[in-house]
Amino acid sequence: MTLPPPIASTAANTILEKLSFCKSLNHIKQLHAHILRTVINHKLNSFLFNLSVSSSSINLSYALNVFSSIPSPPESIVFNPFLRDLSRSSEPRATILFYQRIRHVGGRLDQFSFLPILKAVSKVSALFEGMELHGVAFKIATLCDPFVETGFMDMYASCGRINYARNVFDEMSHRDVVTWNTMIERYCRFGLVDEAFKLFEEMKDSNVMPDEMILCNIVSACGRTGNMRYNRAIYEFLIENDVRMDTHLLTALVTMYAGAGCMDMAREFFRKMSVRNLFVSTAMVSGYSKCGRLDDAQVIFDQTEKKDLVCWTTMISAYVESDYPQEALRVFEEMCCSGIKPDVVSMFSVISACANLGILDKAKWVHSCIHVNGLESELSINNALINMYAKCGGLDATRDVFEKMPRRNVVSWSSMINALSMHGEASDALSLFARMKQENVEPNEVTFVGVLYGCSHSGLVEEGKKIFASMTDEYNITPKLEHYGCMVDLFGRANLLREALEVIESMPVASNVVIWGSLMSACRIHGELELGKFAAKRILELEPDHDGALVLMSNIYAREQRWEDVRNIRRVMEEKNVFKEKGLSRIDQNGKSHEFLIGDKRHKQSNEIYAKLDEVVSKLKLAGYVPDCGSVLVDVEEEEKKDLVLWHSEKLALCFGLMNEEKEEEKDSCGVIRIVKNLRVCEDCHLFFKLVSKVYEREIIVRDRTRFHCYKNGLCSCRDYW
């Protein structure tokens, strides 16, 4: 660095010349000392002013100290540069202190002084100082300056006083497009979209043409509300005024319409984009998926180059939310192959997909991906793994995850309790509940749902009653519908149907379809047809098109051989376009998933499957099996009913599993056949599976709509209570 020439002369022009050479704080200090020693008093202020201005770009703090040492009131032309520099610094409070120093020594502000001070006030939300400054501006009549007025408007909004900002806006004599945009943008930032849109309408009525920035702000705000009236109005304005749309505006428009589900309009603006960024492509994928148009979402996704983690996660989540877990896992595999590393959010979606699929081998693979990517220490991920393994039938793996967790919260304990309950391990669930309390973890509402669920599915009536009472007595937790539902289910499964009805009638809140449905199902199982009809009628009052209630009524009439009533209900269902959900069963074989419907003959091995079914039925009949046709709701011959029962989807899946095990001599690592069904297992299939587990010496695990059934040696983990 070249040092400035030594200071030898006291001439004014020489000192000023030296100022221009100063490049470091050390040089400034040398010159400062020289000025104090040599400059006479009446010229000192001028030299100090110049020194402070020159040094502000080198060391703002030192420059401020020099400025503060000036005894005479400075002129605004001198201190305004200070205000500008201070307002751009990382310490906006210094600007406010400097302003107060100016006021203290009698300095006069001009219109250029206010903006940097207002900027600093806005940064720290110093409302009191801002209001004081507003009074000063009013006194010196600078409020007529539109830049100053806009600055005060922005300051009040930044301090959370949006109404004060609007008052300033309303009192302005002249409003340009910047002023309108500032007020609209502030309304949008506060989430006051209605006010922002009204102001947008006022702006148009005032013949001020909004620019792209205003349109971006209003479009983005309207997109967050999903208000279709606003969306249509914006579209009409753009078309009527032939507005030129840049990339930012088109991005906002696509995002708005995609978020509102108006995919045709979103696609119109999407096609106008010459350059499509990743953000807008992801918005289109998300919009299509929310509308159920997964094929369109996949097309946009496939066309998107250089996809980031957010884009991949959006596509995975789309398939998960639309109940296509296999497709979600396929996309995840593609993401991993492309080199994108998953995060917690993406893994949540993948874990959810795997849980829905119910395939244990897939669950283990997902767990290995979590380990490889260093996410195993995440508490939320471990909690999700507990749920995933539980739904995939891997109770031992569930326990292993829980016990190895470095830390647990109430969600961890509740998830593990629910997993045990789901698998019929009520005693273990109760033991874990006791251990949870011993470790001083306060149970919450979800915990009690899991414990009561376990009591219900294992017939532990007295334990369930005590736990339900403890919610209010010990933990001051008000029972909700879910807890009352568990109690209704508890009494219903134990054939205490009147007690179940009393729970419903004594509830402090109105019962819903789920609770009446629980009673209705219990009545069907225990043959209480009159009470079952009563429950079904309550359901139909709440939900006239409820398929379960209509099917139950049809079932009851079928058992009573009231075929005309059965036909009447079927006619009502057809008129209302109500259909019983079809049973679907899934089994995984050698990494590939196979699905079956009732009487399904689409599978390429159908002939072999039905031949295997005939063989199995013949063997089971020797063990005493007689098909239970009570679940067949049609007036047909008994032999035809038997065929309908034997062709249930889970039986076809089981025969496929048995057949391929024997053919390939390949079994699950534990010799287990695993099946997932979307509906409740019927009584006949339940007996069928128990007998197969004994005759063929196989362990079979079935996940139905409500729980797991582990069939082994002719017994089921549900103890025939499901």
Curated annotation (Swiss-Prot):
Instruction: Tell me which family the UniProt entry assigns to this protein.
Output: Belongs to the PPR family. PCMP-H subfamily.
NCBIfam families per the record? PPR (TIGR00756)
Tree of life domain: Eukaryota
Residues covered by region (Type E motif): 515-590
Note down the stretches annotated as region Type DYW motif.
622-722
Q: Which GO terms describe its molecular function?
A: RNA binding; zinc ion binding
The record's listing under Pfam families reads: DYW_deaminase, E_motif, PPR, PPR_2
Sorted keywords for this record are:
Repeat
Keyword Coiled coil set for record: no
Which positions make up the signal peptide? none
Question: What species does this protein belong to?
Answer: Arabidopsis thaliana
Instruction: Give the PPR repeat ranges.
Output: 75-109, 110-140, 145-175, 176-210, 211-245, 246-276, 277-307, 308-342, 343-377, 378-408, 409-443, 444-479, 480-514
The keyword Repeat belongs to this UniProt entry's keyword annotation: yes
> What protein name is recorded for this chain?
Pentatricopeptide repeat-containing protein At4g14820
Provide the residue span(s) of the region labelled Type E(+) motif.
591-621
Q: Name its GO BP terms in alphabetical order.
A: RNA modification
